[in-house]
Amino acid sequence: MARKKIALIGGGQIGGVLAQLAALRELGDVVMFDIVEGLPQGKMLDIAEVGSVDGFDCNLKGTNSYEDIKGSDVVIVTAGLPRKPGMSRDDLIEVNSKIMTSVAEGIKANAPNAFVIVISNPLDAMVTLCQKITGFPYNRVIGQAGVLDSARFKTFIAWELGVSVKDVNAMTLGGHGDDMVPLVRYASVNGIPVMELLERKYKDKAKAKEVMDAMVKRTRGAGGEVVALLKTGSAFYSPASSAIQMAESILKDQKRVLPTCAYLNGEFGVKGFYVGVPCVLGENGVEQILEFELDAEEQAMMDKSVAAVKELVGSMK
């Protein structure tokens, strides 16, 4: 049986981690594209040379030609400028829109049957632009945001409660920005509501809410927290791991339920926009969007987040 093929567009920090993770998990052969001559070739050679050490068998190739992504099953797009301290994701829209336009044209011409996972920021606008230019079906063009935002939320909960992050279940909805919606009501530790555990820990409902509010705020600003600490770039380990989880679910038809930036056609009261919602990801890309009832407070936050997405998308020239 022929191996699957994964194409990575962008040879920066995220691209390098993506290539290594794809190889370690043996998801298929991997090709990395970048416009900088020598950069993708060097990174892929570096990773390939430890195949005997890490125990993986796959073909790794770096290239400066879009022709080499032909036959790809999944394309993951990281190309674009990263944030610097003091910048929001939205500040990148003008320059990264130009980059995404070129990238999407390259994908359309050379990998017309691929599933596309966009990581580039501002995410909600970039995935919208990518789908528009490629013309691919909505189920085949998605964005990575919710898996990472949810992972950050889970991490902060685990640290606060002193439990394994493996036992924490939590999710965010909405756009990939300061108005994202961490779902407090559905956060649990092995089925036990997190708010109940916080109330027992602090023996004070007001204090428990204060602690949760702080975790929600930190989740919303988590990407900026990393940017401020690094000073020269943005997060790259966590976005790469999150995108690989999505790609693996598609390539292996795992049907994982993952928060995904997906095109909505009336779900959650949103029509005609890409927004983060729980999706079943399988061999057909987005196979289901799992809709559920939001309470009044959650709906208000979701409406605010969607409004921010609409404004962002509308600002693209």
From Swiss-Prot:
Reaction catalysis annotation: (S)-malate + NAD(+) = oxaloacetate + NADH + H(+)
Organism ancestry: Bacteria, Pseudomonadati, Thermodesulfobacteriota, Desulfuromonadia, Geobacterales
InterPro entries: L-lactate/malate_DH, Lactate/malate_DH_C, Lactate/malate_DH_N, Lactate_DH/Glyco_Ohase_4_C, Malate_DH_type3, NAD(P)-bd_dom_sf
Organism superkingdom: Bacteria
Family from the record: Belongs to the LDH/MDH superfamily. MDH type 3 family.
Database matches in SUPFAM superfamilies: LDH C-terminal domain-like (SSF56327), NAD(P)-binding Rossmann-fold domains (SSF51735)
Stated role: Catalyzes the reversible oxidation of malate to oxaloacetate.
A Pfam entry, by short name: Ldh_1_C
Residues that hold substrate according to the record: R83, R89, N121, R152
Protein name, entry field: Malate dehydrogenase
Annotated NAD(+) binding sites: G10, G11, G12, Q13, I14, G15, D34, N96, I119, S120, N121
GO biological process, one term: lactate metabolic process
